[in-house]
């Protein structure tokens, strides 16, 4: 059985490393990108099984734009997306669209507890 490949798209290297340190010891392969454009390139190159995606990166709602672009591509629209953000604690919270506006498979607020992250990743990969 091959390892599931997880793409983490976040401009915070500390968060990316924390996710890597949580997932890799549990049998996952982790690749990363620092913004939406780089993330889309990694989706094409790496064919991840799951994308963990921050909302706000190089621009406000950069992650939402990436998720929309993934949904527009038939080869990528079936890849589950777990959205993570600290947006609930910022002035941008009012800009966050409803679930009807974007297609994501799960949402977690930062900071994310390792146990919760592992549970959500496993659930999304085995749905």
Listing of model-derived features with the role each one plays in the protein:
Residues 1-7, 113-127:
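Non-catalytic signal-transmission and effector/linker regions of two-component phosphorelay proteins
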Residues 32-41, 62-63:
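Helix N-cap/capping motif at the beta->alpha junctions
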Residues 46-53, 57, 81:
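Active-site beta3 strand of CheY-like receiver
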Residues 61-65, 88-108, 115, 119:
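Alpha4 helix (beta4-alpha4-beta5 surface) of REC/receiver domains from two-component response regulators
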Residues 41, 64-77:
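Short amphipathic alpha-helix used as the core "switch/output" element in two-component signaling
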Residues 12-16, 114:
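Short acidic/polar segment at the start of the alpha1 helix of CheY-like receiver
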């Amino acid at each position: 059985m091959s390892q599931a490949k997880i793409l983490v798209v976040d401009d915070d290297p500390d968060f990316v490393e924390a996710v890597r340190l949580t997932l890799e010891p549990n049998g996952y392969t982790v690749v990363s990108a620092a913004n939406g454009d780089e993330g889309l390139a990694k989706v094409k190159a790496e064919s991840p099984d799951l994308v963990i995606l921050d909302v706000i990166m190089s621009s406000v709602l950069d992650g939402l734009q990436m998720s929309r672009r993934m949904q527009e591509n038939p080869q990528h629209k079936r890849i589950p997306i777990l959205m993570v953000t600290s947006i609930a604690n910022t002035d941008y919270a009012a800009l966050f669209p409803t679930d009807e506006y974007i297609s994501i498979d799960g949402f977690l607020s930062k900071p994310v507890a390792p146990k919760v992250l592992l549970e959500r990743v496993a659930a999304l990969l085995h749905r």
